[in-house]
Amino acid sequence: MEDFVRQCFNPMIVELAEKAMKEYGEDLKIETNKFAAICTHLEVCFMYSDFHFINEQGESIVVELDDPNALLKHRFEIIEGRDRTMAWTVVNSICNTTGAEKPKFLPDLYDYKKNRFIEIGVTRREVHIYYLEKANKIKSENTHIHIFSFTGEEMATKADYTLDEESRARIKTRLFTIRQEMANRGLWDSFRQSERGEETIEERFEITGTMRRLADQSLPPNFFCLENFRAYVDGFEPNGCIEGKLSQMSKEVNAKIEPFLKTTPRPIKLPDGPPCFQRSKFLLMDALKLSIEDPSHEGEGIPLYDAIKCMRTFFGWKEPYIVKPHERGINSNYLQSWKQVLAELQDIENEEKIPRTKTMKKTSQLKWALGENMAPEKVDFENCRDISDLKQYDSDEPELRSLSSWIQNEFNKACELTDSIWIELDEIGEDVAPIEYIASMRRNYFTAEVSHCRATEYIMKGVYINTALLNASCAAMDDFQLIPMISKCRTKEGRRKTNLYGFIIKGRSHLRNDTDVVNFVSMEFSLTDPRLEPHKWEKYCVLEIGDMLLRSAIGQMSRPMFLYVRTNGTSKIKMKWGMEMRRCLLQSLQQIESMIEAESSVKEKDMTKEFFENKSETWPIGESPKGVEEGSIGKVCRTLLAKSVFNSLYASPQLEGFSAESRKLLLVVQALRDNLEPGTFDLGGLYEAIEECLINDPWVLLNASWFNSFLTHALK
């Protein structure tokens, strides 16, 4: 087939087809039928355009012999055969000069006489089938479709064939000749059978046997067989009268569509109750680090060695005591656990060689804190069949909690800049394609905006803690292992820094299933006095463990150092996602990228540089009771990142539900702002679905309060 193509077609056409296949990563040595099809399509496009001109009077004429004196303009602009970037440039230019609507897919030609884009099709199947596939894919009134077949048939939109009879006959004759030549060489059958439909059409394959019975059983109400349902779906017009559509779907439905006006929506009702509490797996804005710069000690990089080195930098330790007890816990056990950690670290230092990991003694306080022997005994269900009153144990409804100001403060803090660099610029090879150059430029600009951000610190801290905990859970299942909470960064001057936030002690961890829980006790340093916001620290027992000297503008001052201790738990699946928190960087980069793309398509050039370097321009960041908050592009990057990070830190079923349900209301409000006159039914049910997710989660409650601010300002 390849030899035939090279003999049969003009070398320029062959070269263009080779380029097209290379652009899509296809091998013409393997996909020979596709190679022939591309050449055929190119030739038909060129023949369609050949000899057709517009004269000075604006009339369409056919000129076969070049008359050098005639001032003629080509009637057709050829788009097919150009590389994608150039082709879109031509399309944009035509749209700008003629006012034509921009097509979704690249067409083949533009007709200056009839002012429309043309899609040419060449098919080895029936023309009407191919025509319908094309029309289904393009879904545009403005692109004219013209299909030719190898049997001399043709079909065009509204039977408007654009060209004169003779020009079309020339194309049909050429296609017939190609078919004959292929048949003579025994290539036609393979070529005819290799044609695939447009990718948007699903093949109709027959379903038989069990699958057929299951399909018939699982139809929506009022459909008696699969064909009946298929016919309904195929004939469903999406933009008809909604009430009619609903009544078609089920006899039970009699929804009345209510107009959605500015006065329709009410604010989301947030729950009353005691203030919500901190539930993240580690401290955020309240965390305190003991740090070493330019670490070069023996065993540097081994967590336990690093932790001991960091602990040695602090000299203000004192006899610990409880300043804020945990309401329901045995607080003396938390105190004893910290004393045990200090004592066992001291024992390590007295040893000749420091071990790589530390297994804690199974003392009564740690057994209590880690819930050892607390789980009810599991009994095989087979042994319980005869028990008459077997039932699942009752679980209490969660207590409703109200929004508290601390979660907004946490979010604001996450958007701020620190004086350290938390991520390095990725070392990626040289750019080879223009798109890679733009992508790496965007990535570098974005990295510069977020590398110092506190949310990025939380990412690196989360990745480290979850990785260390999952490793220990698998490697030392029965041990109470001591895991330092460590992060690494660079100072502004580029010096390496190792930070210790505190310690975790892991309980027994025979994790068979993804959701099996491993208990752990976290002990984290802080300078925050828990008595200022006791409701935030409901789940913690807080000790005072030392005094820290801090340098300030007025000289040195001493501040008490606290230790926040709590029992917590996590699972394999949660640790797996925690290890992948770097994805948050990617998600927020993609959101920024879509903003740049929107700007670039308006200006019709890449706006990355202007977007990041125009410091005077402000962008919307979010809603507050004061109105739409605006800030620099850097602030937008950091806010989007912080949102993504908090979605990971505070992930919960409440958040999933609230996000999914509130999005529906958001879309309706946006439709109202765009003057699309939206209608709704059962708006009360939607509010119910949103509000049942507002129970006690601080991040969900904050998002709901932001949503209310949005409603207020969007509907003014």
UniProtKB/Swiss-Prot annotation:
InterPro entries: INFV_PA, PA/PA-X, PA/PA-X_sf
Disulfide partners: none
Pfam families named among the record's database cross-references: Flu_PA
E.C. designation(s): 3.1.-.-
Gene name for this UniProt entry: PA
A GO cellular component annotation in the UniProt record: host cell nucleus
Motif (Nuclear localization signal 1 (NLS1)): 124-139
Gene3D superfamilies, per the entry: Influenza RNA-dependent RNA polymerase subunit PA, endonuclease domain (3.40.91.90)
Species name: Influenza A virus (strain A/Swine/Colorado/1/1977 H3N2)
Protein name: Polymerase acidic protein
One term of GO molecular function: metal ion binding
Keywords, alphabetical: Cap snatching, Endonuclease, Eukaryotic host gene expression shutoff by virus, Eukaryotic host transcription shutoff by virus, Host cytoplasm, Host gene expression shutoff by virus, Host nucleus, Host-virus interaction, Hydrolase, Inhibition of host RNA polymerase II by virus, Manganese, Metal-binding, Nuclease, Phosphoprotein
Annotated residues for binding of Mn(2+) 1: 41, 108, 119-120
